[in-house]
């Protein structure tokens, strides 16, 4: 989408999923606006995408959303500014309305498969509410969900430069083999220079 490649990365914890995203030259996904939120629910954190990539359809994903540095100061791990007026509006209704007492230990954002931004709230326990996201706050390991048997991965978003029909990304790799493996995870290879241009 645009100049980003979205890739599922290993996510034993939010911190490790972010590190795995960094190896691919990116960060855990940043949701910039309602349009990207809807697109992501249909294409990135969708059951169909998970199944196509060998995961079960109820897989959850870590996002770049967090307040790990300063409690209550939500940001994206990419450091990007987004079109949201208030990032707390992205927190799922149950967390926001009933579980704020846990927020000191819940610093990392996750999302269930297929979840989109809600223009009109759908959780009957908290309706009426409007314009709320579905980002679940949890500890670094997603302990509650992981201990309940949920599969959790990360969604990496890597910016690229397009030239012709190629996309160029800087990936991490202390060795050629590791750099090539990271390029493969994005569906490509290390660069081939075809001519002087």
Question: Model-predicted segments: where are they?
Answer:
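Extracellular, disulfide-bonded carbohydrate-recognition/adhesion ectodomains
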Residues: 1-197
């Amino acid at each position: 989408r645009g100049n980003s490649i979205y890739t599922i990365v290993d996510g034993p914890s939010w911190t490790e999923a972010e590190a795995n995203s960094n190896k691919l030259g990116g960060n855990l996904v940043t949701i910039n606006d309602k349009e990207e939120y809807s697109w992501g629910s249909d294409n990135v954190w969708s059951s169909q995408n998970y199944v196509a990539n060998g995961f079960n359809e109820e897989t959850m994903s870590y996002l770049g959303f967090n307040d790990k540095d300063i409690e209550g100061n939500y940001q994206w791990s990419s450091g990007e500014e987004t079109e949201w007026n208030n990032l707390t509006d992205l927190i799922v209704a149950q967390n926001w309305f009933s579980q704020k007492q846990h927020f000191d230990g819940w610093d990392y954002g996750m999302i269930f498969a297929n979840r989109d931004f809600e223009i009109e709230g759908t959780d009957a326990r908290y309706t009426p509410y409007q314009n709320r996201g579905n980002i679940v706050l949890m500890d670094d390991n997603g302990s509650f969900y992981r201990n309940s048997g949920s599969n959790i991965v990360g969604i990496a978003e890597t910016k690229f430069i397009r030239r012709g029909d190629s996309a160029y990304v800087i990936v991490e790799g202390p060795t050629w083999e590791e750099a090539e493996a990271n390029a493969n995870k994005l569906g490509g290879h290390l660069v081939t220079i075809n001519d002087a241009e």
